[in-house]
């Protein structure tokens, strides 16, 4: 039976490695969704190369540095898997590789939209070759931190803290994106192009996290405990962020809530096996507060531009999660020796956790600062202003768009929106009293009427114009918005500049049909009393020329049967 269980958990080990690999897709979707469409292809490429370059680096020497024969508690050493196929534990190699790739890919989002691709590739190779393997050896490879009792079950410190700290250094050295801060330093929200994609990425990551945290479980009880704590912490963190943003901004912030879910997952990672459900509940509350605070701190005090919240999620909550082990570890059945300050363990474990953070942070900060500095002074770290404005898809990869053939507009069913708008608001006055019609005529006998309205109103306006005898019109998709005094919108805690919304421009030229009838028909079709019903513009037309016949004026508007 023992042999069977060993085989079962060995298979589980590799299945969970596949779960963690799938998290690369989650990171790619979160980062792509939280950034602008002109950089989506670049984001995907960076996440792909994180894993591919990381595999090469890990194969050459990274795995040996992590899991090789311990040397003085500082580094592992042994033959490279590249030349020692028979002597390599390939289950361990695969498992540790996907964890290494996770640490590397965290940085992509914080440095998004302005980093040279070649520079990012160099960074990715270095962190997978040397930086991550050495500090991970201290924690999991038999190094000096593990001998002191440092507890980081699945990587709050070894993976997320390292990735988040590297992201902070990289984003700081890069500087903010163009338009992120006003001249007086006020931060401006730059919304990502698809929260839908970002949310998909968040759910993929949450799903993968069950493998991320549960992969090293050695029995069913421990696995069940890990699944429970890995569920409770992010759920509570998300609720916490929702309440904070709802109270602070008047409405719950979707992007921040997605960050809150990831923050809770990061914070519980270190102690997922060592805390109980109450501890994970408290950790969830703390991580929700932490992610909101760090986002505010970066934007309003440090002026560091982090497009996706990688620093707040991974650095801030990597620190928090590691410290919380020293506070809330309760000596579970599977980890009886791990007891935190609040469960009678005194300050010993807490002190070891703090020492581990200090050591890992110092190693990461020094090595990654040197790496980024050398890159900056050689190949350069940041693209030019022109390249940033055009977009990295075009300038770095020759890609016109990651969405070729798709219009990047909100495609919302018109009937649904009309039902919501028309049924939820009753105009205080009648149409003619609310918007009196007065058409001023000039000497011209031909007029052009331009109607700007929402796309979902097109069927109504077309039917209304057809009813008064207008069968010809020009319809164009345009973008625009009105500015309503006193309304302020926020994205991830920062005010958002004016955003353009998809509209339709309907143009008709009339000579026989009175302009007043056209205006009245349009008003009747569009009026709800809500902001955004649209606008009508009336112009005089000096002349009309039909190209096919040469007819001019009113004759050019007539069609022969």
Predicted segments — roles?
Residues 395-402, 413-561:
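Positively charged, small/polar-rich N-terminal and surface patches that mediate targeting and assembly
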Residues 1-439:
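Glycine- and aromatic-enriched membrane alpha-helices
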